[in-house]
Protein backbone atom coordinates (compact mmCIF):
# COMPACT_ATOMS: atom_id res chain seq x y z
CA UNK A 1 0.00 0.00 0.00
CA UNK A 2 1.55 3.30 -1.05
CA UNK A 3 1.15 6.57 0.76
CA UNK A 4 -0.11 8.93 -1.92
CA UNK A 5 -0.82 12.00 0.18
CA UNK A 6 -1.01 13.38 3.69
CA UNK A 7 -3.31 16.35 4.24
CA UNK A 8 -2.84 18.48 7.35
CA UNK A 9 -5.89 20.53 8.45
CA UNK A 10 -4.14 23.33 7.86
CA UNK A 11 -6.49 26.21 8.36
CA UNK A 12 -6.36 25.48 12.05
CA UNK A 13 -2.60 25.84 12.03
CA UNK A 14 -2.60 29.05 10.04
CA UNK A 15 -5.40 30.79 11.95
CA UNK A 16 -4.42 32.39 15.28
CA UNK A 17 -7.94 31.67 16.51
CA UNK A 18 -6.91 28.08 17.08
CA UNK A 19 -3.66 28.80 18.91
CA UNK A 20 -2.65 26.50 21.73
CA UNK A 21 -3.69 27.58 25.22
CA UNK A 22 -0.53 27.75 27.32
CA UNK A 23 -0.93 26.34 30.82
CA UNK A 24 1.16 27.64 33.72
CA UNK A 25 4.29 25.56 34.14
CA UNK A 26 5.87 24.85 37.53
CA UNK A 27 8.63 27.20 38.57
CA UNK A 28 11.79 25.11 38.74
CA UNK A 29 14.80 27.40 38.56
CA UNK A 30 17.51 26.98 41.16
CA UNK A 31 16.35 23.63 42.50
CA UNK A 32 19.08 21.54 40.92
CA UNK A 33 22.81 22.08 41.42
CA UNK A 34 25.41 20.30 39.29
CA UNK A 35 29.10 20.63 40.10
CA UNK A 36 31.73 19.41 37.63
CA UNK A 37 35.22 18.33 38.71
CA UNK A 38 38.13 16.72 36.85
CA UNK A 39 39.16 13.27 38.12
CA UNK A 40 41.56 12.24 35.36
CA UNK A 41 43.02 13.27 32.04
CA UNK A 42 39.62 13.18 30.31
CA UNK A 43 37.38 11.89 33.08
CA UNK A 44 35.00 14.18 34.95
CA UNK A 45 32.66 13.78 37.89
CA UNK A 46 29.24 15.42 38.12
CA UNK A 47 27.74 15.88 41.59
CA UNK A 48 23.99 16.40 41.20
CA UNK A 49 22.32 17.89 44.30
CA UNK A 50 18.68 18.62 45.06
CA UNK A 51 18.63 22.19 46.37
CA UNK A 52 14.84 22.40 46.36
CA UNK A 53 12.66 22.13 49.46
CA UNK A 54 10.82 19.12 48.06
CA UNK A 55 11.72 15.73 46.56
CA UNK A 56 12.64 15.66 42.88
CA UNK A 57 11.73 12.88 40.46
CA UNK A 58 13.90 13.41 37.38
CA UNK A 59 13.73 11.66 34.01
CA UNK A 60 17.02 9.84 33.56
CA UNK A 61 17.43 10.13 29.78
CA UNK A 62 19.74 12.53 27.92
CA UNK A 63 21.57 13.77 31.01
CA UNK A 64 24.21 12.63 33.53
CA UNK A 65 21.91 9.85 34.77
CA UNK A 66 21.94 8.22 31.32
CA UNK A 67 24.53 5.50 30.65
CA UNK A 68 24.12 5.87 26.88
CA UNK A 69 26.74 7.97 25.01
CA UNK A 70 24.47 11.02 24.92
CA UNK A 71 25.68 14.62 25.10
CA UNK A 72 26.16 15.41 28.77
CA UNK A 73 28.56 18.33 28.35
CA UNK A 74 29.72 20.81 25.74
CA UNK A 75 33.46 21.01 25.10
CA UNK A 76 35.27 24.09 23.81
CA UNK A 77 38.81 24.58 22.49
CA UNK A 78 40.00 28.17 22.03
CA UNK A 79 36.38 29.31 22.12
CA UNK A 80 35.24 26.87 19.43
CA UNK A 81 32.92 23.94 20.10
CA UNK A 82 34.46 20.49 19.76
CA UNK A 83 32.31 18.19 17.62
CA UNK A 84 30.13 15.78 19.57
CA UNK A 85 30.62 12.18 18.40
CA UNK A 86 27.97 10.41 20.49
CA UNK A 87 24.22 10.02 19.99
CA UNK A 88 21.06 12.07 20.34
CA UNK A 89 18.19 9.76 21.29
CA UNK A 90 14.45 10.26 20.94
CA UNK A 91 12.56 8.90 23.98
CA UNK A 92 9.02 7.48 24.08
CA UNK A 93 7.30 9.57 26.77
CA UNK A 94 4.03 7.66 27.22
CA UNK A 95 3.46 5.34 30.21
CA UNK A 96 6.92 5.88 31.67
CA UNK A 97 7.84 3.23 34.28
CA UNK A 98 9.36 3.95 37.71
CA UNK A 99 12.82 2.87 36.58
CA UNK A 100 12.96 5.75 34.08
CA UNK A 101 13.20 8.25 36.94
CA UNK A 102 15.84 9.18 39.50
CA UNK A 103 14.52 10.39 42.86
CA UNK A 104 16.39 12.90 45.02
CA UNK A 105 15.26 13.98 48.47
CA UNK A 106 15.99 17.59 49.57
CA UNK A 107 19.74 17.96 50.08
CA UNK A 108 20.55 14.55 48.56
CA UNK A 109 23.39 14.23 46.04
CA UNK A 110 24.22 11.64 43.40
CA UNK A 111 27.60 11.35 41.69
CA UNK A 112 28.12 10.32 38.09
CA UNK A 113 31.38 9.92 36.17
CA UNK A 114 32.00 10.16 32.44
CA UNK A 115 35.01 10.05 30.14
CA UNK A 116 34.48 12.92 27.73
CA UNK A 117 37.01 11.48 25.26
CA UNK A 118 34.61 8.63 24.41
CA UNK A 119 32.40 11.08 22.48
CA UNK A 120 34.84 13.80 21.39
CA UNK A 121 38.23 14.05 19.70
CA UNK A 122 40.59 15.55 22.28
CA UNK A 123 43.81 14.32 20.70
CA UNK A 124 44.93 17.89 20.00
CA UNK A 125 45.46 18.22 23.73
CA UNK A 126 45.93 21.39 25.73
CA UNK A 127 43.32 23.55 27.40
CA UNK A 128 39.62 22.71 27.08
CA UNK A 129 36.55 24.27 28.70
CA UNK A 130 33.74 21.94 29.77
CA UNK A 131 30.22 23.25 30.37
CA UNK A 132 26.77 21.78 30.88
CA UNK A 133 23.35 23.39 31.01
CA UNK A 134 19.81 22.51 30.06
CA UNK A 135 16.50 21.20 31.33
CA UNK A 136 15.66 17.85 32.90
CA UNK A 137 11.99 16.77 32.72
CA UNK A 138 10.41 15.81 36.04
CA UNK A 139 7.28 14.15 37.41
CA UNK A 140 5.54 14.58 40.73
CA UNK A 141 6.52 12.09 43.43
CA UNK A 142 3.26 10.12 43.21
CA UNK A 143 3.09 10.07 39.39
CA UNK A 144 5.13 9.09 36.33
CA UNK A 145 3.63 11.77 34.09
CA UNK A 146 6.10 14.49 33.17
CA UNK A 147 4.70 17.80 34.39
CA UNK A 148 7.62 20.21 34.17
CA UNK A 149 11.31 20.68 33.57
CA UNK A 150 14.11 21.48 36.01
CA UNK A 151 16.68 23.98 34.78
CA UNK A 152 20.37 23.55 35.58
CA UNK A 153 23.60 25.34 34.76
CA UNK A 154 26.79 23.66 35.95
CA UNK A 155 30.08 25.43 36.60
CA UNK A 156 32.53 25.82 33.73
CA UNK A 157 35.40 23.38 34.14
CA UNK A 158 38.88 24.09 32.75
CA UNK A 159 40.91 20.98 31.87
CA UNK A 160 44.46 20.52 30.55
CA UNK A 161 44.35 17.36 28.44
CA UNK A 162 47.24 15.14 27.36
CA UNK A 163 46.32 14.50 23.72
CA UNK A 164 48.37 11.30 23.42
CA UNK A 165 46.61 9.78 26.41
CA UNK A 166 43.22 10.95 25.12
CA UNK A 167 43.93 9.10 21.87
CA UNK A 168 44.02 5.78 23.74
CA UNK A 169 40.44 6.13 25.03
CA UNK A 170 38.04 3.79 23.22
CA UNK A 171 35.32 5.61 21.30
CA UNK A 172 31.68 4.95 22.17
CA UNK A 173 30.66 5.00 18.49
CA UNK A 174 32.32 3.20 15.61
CA UNK A 175 32.19 4.37 11.96
CA UNK A 176 29.07 3.28 10.07
CA UNK A 177 28.64 1.94 6.54
CA UNK A 178 27.99 4.88 4.21
CA UNK A 179 27.54 2.95 0.97
CA UNK A 180 23.75 3.00 1.02
CA UNK A 181 21.02 5.53 1.95
CA UNK A 182 19.05 2.72 3.61
CA UNK A 183 21.48 0.11 4.91
CA UNK A 184 21.04 -3.61 4.34
CA UNK A 185 19.33 -3.77 7.74
CA UNK A 186 16.28 -2.17 6.07
CA UNK A 187 14.21 -5.02 4.65
CA UNK A 188 10.57 -6.11 4.58
CA UNK A 189 8.07 -4.32 6.80
CA UNK A 190 10.74 -2.27 8.55
CA UNK A 191 11.94 -0.85 5.25
CA UNK A 192 8.36 -0.08 4.23
CA UNK A 193 7.65 1.69 7.54
CA UNK A 194 10.87 3.70 7.35
CA UNK A 195 10.25 4.81 3.77
CA UNK A 196 6.69 5.89 4.57
CA UNK A 197 7.88 7.82 7.64
CA UNK A 198 10.52 9.62 5.57
CA UNK A 199 7.89 10.55 2.97
CA UNK A 200 5.51 11.77 5.68
CA UNK A 201 8.31 13.82 7.26
CA UNK A 202 8.83 15.57 3.93
CA UNK A 203 5.18 16.62 3.67
CA UNK A 204 4.95 17.54 7.35
CA UNK A 205 8.11 19.67 7.14
CA UNK A 206 6.93 21.43 3.99
CA UNK A 207 3.64 22.34 5.63
CA UNK A 208 5.38 23.42 8.85
CA UNK A 209 7.56 25.81 6.84
CA UNK A 210 4.38 27.38 5.42
CA UNK A 211 2.85 27.68 8.89
CA UNK A 212 6.02 29.28 10.28
CA UNK A 213 5.91 31.79 7.44
CA UNK A 214 2.27 32.78 8.05
CA UNK A 215 1.33 32.16 11.70
CA UNK A 216 3.07 34.60 14.04
CA UNK A 217 1.20 33.38 17.12
CA UNK A 218 2.33 29.80 16.63
CA UNK A 219 5.89 30.97 15.94
CA UNK A 220 5.84 32.92 19.22
CA UNK A 221 4.53 29.90 21.14
CA UNK A 222 7.37 27.60 20.14
CA UNK A 223 10.27 29.89 19.17
CA UNK A 224 9.57 32.89 21.48
CA UNK A 225 10.04 35.53 18.77
CA UNK A 226 8.35 36.58 15.53
CA UNK A 227 10.97 38.82 13.94
CA UNK A 228 12.00 38.21 10.34
CA UNK A 229 15.32 36.59 11.28
CA UNK A 230 13.64 34.03 13.55
CA UNK A 231 10.94 33.34 10.99
CA UNK A 232 13.48 32.78 8.22
CA UNK A 233 15.70 30.49 10.33
CA UNK A 234 12.70 28.30 11.21
CA UNK A 235 11.43 28.23 7.63
CA UNK A 236 14.90 27.39 6.32
CA UNK A 237 15.35 24.49 8.72
CA UNK A 238 11.94 22.99 7.98
CA UNK A 239 12.63 23.38 4.25
CA UNK A 240 16.01 21.66 4.64
CA UNK A 241 14.41 18.79 6.57
CA UNK A 242 11.77 18.41 3.85
CA UNK A 243 14.50 18.28 1.22
CA UNK A 244 16.48 15.70 3.21
CA UNK A 245 13.39 13.52 3.81
CA UNK A 246 13.97 11.34 0.77
CA UNK A 247 15.17 7.83 0.02
CA UNK A 248 16.63 8.80 -3.35
CA UNK A 249 19.35 11.21 -2.26
CA UNK A 250 20.43 13.36 0.61
CA UNK A 251 23.26 12.88 3.08
CA UNK A 252 21.57 10.99 5.90
CA UNK A 253 21.84 7.20 6.17
CA UNK A 254 19.41 4.96 8.04
CA UNK A 255 19.64 1.72 9.97
CA UNK A 256 16.31 -0.05 10.45
CA UNK A 257 17.73 -2.25 13.23
CA UNK A 258 20.07 -1.41 16.10
CA UNK A 259 23.36 -2.76 14.81
CA UNK A 260 25.37 -0.53 17.18
CA UNK A 261 23.49 -1.56 20.31
CA UNK A 262 22.44 1.83 21.67
CA UNK A 263 18.65 1.36 21.75
CA UNK A 264 17.34 1.49 25.31
CA UNK A 265 13.87 0.18 26.21
CA UNK A 266 12.30 3.65 25.72
CA UNK A 267 14.42 4.84 22.77
CA UNK A 268 12.42 5.41 19.57
CA UNK A 269 15.44 6.29 17.43
CA UNK A 270 18.86 7.86 17.78
CA UNK A 271 21.17 9.96 15.64
CA UNK A 272 24.94 10.08 15.26
CA UNK A 273 25.43 13.72 14.23
CA UNK A 274 29.14 13.28 13.50
CA UNK A 275 28.22 10.67 10.88
CA UNK A 276 24.78 11.96 9.76
CA UNK A 277 23.31 8.58 10.60
CA UNK A 278 19.92 7.62 12.08
CA UNK A 279 18.99 4.30 13.70
CA UNK A 280 15.40 3.21 14.34
CA UNK A 281 14.73 1.24 17.52
CA UNK A 282 12.02 -1.43 18.03
CA UNK A 283 9.52 1.05 19.53
CA UNK A 284 9.59 3.04 16.27
CA UNK A 285 7.74 0.24 14.50
CA UNK A 286 5.04 0.09 17.19
CA UNK A 287 4.11 3.75 16.72
CA UNK A 288 1.59 5.24 14.28
CA UNK A 289 2.84 6.87 11.13
CA UNK A 290 1.13 10.09 12.25
CA UNK A 291 -0.82 10.73 15.42
CA UNK A 292 -3.92 12.89 15.88
CA UNK A 293 -2.93 13.59 19.50
CA UNK A 294 -1.58 17.08 20.15
CA UNK A 295 2.16 16.83 20.88
CA UNK A 296 1.91 13.07 20.54
CA UNK A 297 4.79 11.00 19.20
CA UNK A 298 4.79 9.15 15.91
CA UNK A 299 7.09 7.89 13.17
CA UNK A 300 6.95 10.97 10.94
CA UNK A 301 7.83 13.52 13.62
CA UNK A 302 10.53 11.16 14.91
CA UNK A 303 12.20 11.26 11.49
CA UNK A 304 11.79 15.04 11.41
CA UNK A 305 13.30 15.33 14.90
CA UNK A 306 16.27 13.12 14.07
CA UNK A 307 17.08 14.86 10.78
CA UNK A 308 17.39 18.22 12.57
CA UNK A 309 20.30 16.71 14.53
CA UNK A 310 22.40 16.17 11.41
CA UNK A 311 24.97 18.90 10.63
CA UNK A 312 24.99 18.04 6.92
CA UNK A 313 21.45 19.43 6.70
CA UNK A 314 21.74 22.82 8.45
CA UNK A 315 24.58 24.16 10.55
CA UNK A 316 24.66 24.50 13.43
CA UNK A 317 22.61 21.34 13.87
CA UNK A 318 19.96 20.98 16.56
CA UNK A 319 20.74 19.53 19.98
CA UNK A 320 18.50 18.45 22.87
CA UNK A 321 18.27 21.51 25.11
CA UNK A 322 14.81 20.47 26.25
CA UNK A 323 12.63 17.43 25.74
CA UNK A 324 8.82 17.47 25.65
CA UNK A 325 6.40 20.38 25.49
CA UNK A 326 6.91 21.45 29.13
CA UNK A 327 10.65 21.75 28.62
CA UNK A 328 10.32 23.42 25.22
CA UNK A 329 8.14 26.15 26.73
CA UNK A 330 10.93 26.92 29.22
CA UNK A 331 13.66 27.48 26.63
CA UNK A 332 14.79 30.94 25.62
CA UNK A 333 14.63 32.10 22.01
CA UNK A 334 18.17 31.08 21.07
CA UNK A 335 17.83 27.64 22.66
CA UNK A 336 14.49 27.12 20.93
CA UNK A 337 16.02 27.67 17.50
CA UNK A 338 18.63 24.98 18.18
CA UNK A 339 16.37 22.44 19.91
CA UNK A 340 15.24 19.38 17.92
CA UNK A 341 12.04 18.75 19.87
CA UNK A 342 10.85 22.31 19.29
CA UNK A 343 10.58 21.55 15.57
CA UNK A 344 8.85 18.18 15.96
CA UNK A 345 6.38 19.59 18.51
CA UNK A 346 5.67 22.61 16.29
CA UNK A 347 4.93 20.21 13.45
CA UNK A 348 2.26 18.27 15.35
CA UNK A 349 0.84 20.91 17.68
CA UNK A 350 -2.81 21.29 18.64
CA UNK A 351 -5.48 21.26 15.93
CA UNK A 352 -3.32 19.34 13.47
CA UNK A 353 -5.46 16.85 11.58
CA UNK A 354 -4.15 14.22 9.21
CA UNK A 355 -6.03 12.37 6.52
CA UNK A 356 -4.48 9.45 4.68
CA UNK A 357 -5.31 8.49 1.11
CA UNK A 358 -3.95 5.15 -0.07
Curated annotation (Swiss-Prot):
Binds 1 zinc ion per subunit. It comes from the Eukaryota. PROSITE patterns: ZINC_PROTEASE. Its main location: secreted. Zn(2+) binds at residues 305, 309, 320. Its EC number is 3.4.24.39. Secreted metalloproteinase that allows assimilation of proteinaceous substrates. Shows high activities on basic nuclear substrates such as histone and protamine. May be involved in virulence. One of its GO terms (molecular function) is metalloendopeptidase activity. GO terms for biological process: proteolysis. This is Neutral protease 2 homolog MEP8. It catalyses: Preferential cleavage of bonds with hydrophobic residues in P1'. Also 3-Asn-|-Gln-4 and 8-Gly-|-Ser-9 bonds in insulin B chain. Disulfide bonds join 186-256, 263-281. The active site is at residue 306. Belongs to the peptidase M35 family. The lineage of its organism: Eukaryota, Fungi, Dikarya, Ascomycota, Pezizomycotina.
Amino acid sequence: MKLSSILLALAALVSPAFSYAISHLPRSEGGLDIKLTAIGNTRIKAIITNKADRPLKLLRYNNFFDDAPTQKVEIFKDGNAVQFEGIYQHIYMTDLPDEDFISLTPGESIEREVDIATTADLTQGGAFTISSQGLIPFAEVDSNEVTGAMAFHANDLEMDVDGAVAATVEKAIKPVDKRSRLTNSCTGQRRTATVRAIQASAQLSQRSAQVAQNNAQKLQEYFKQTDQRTRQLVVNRFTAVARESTVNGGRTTYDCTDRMGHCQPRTIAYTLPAQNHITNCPIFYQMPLLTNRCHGQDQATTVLHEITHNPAIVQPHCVDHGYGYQAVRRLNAQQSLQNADTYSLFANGKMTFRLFLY
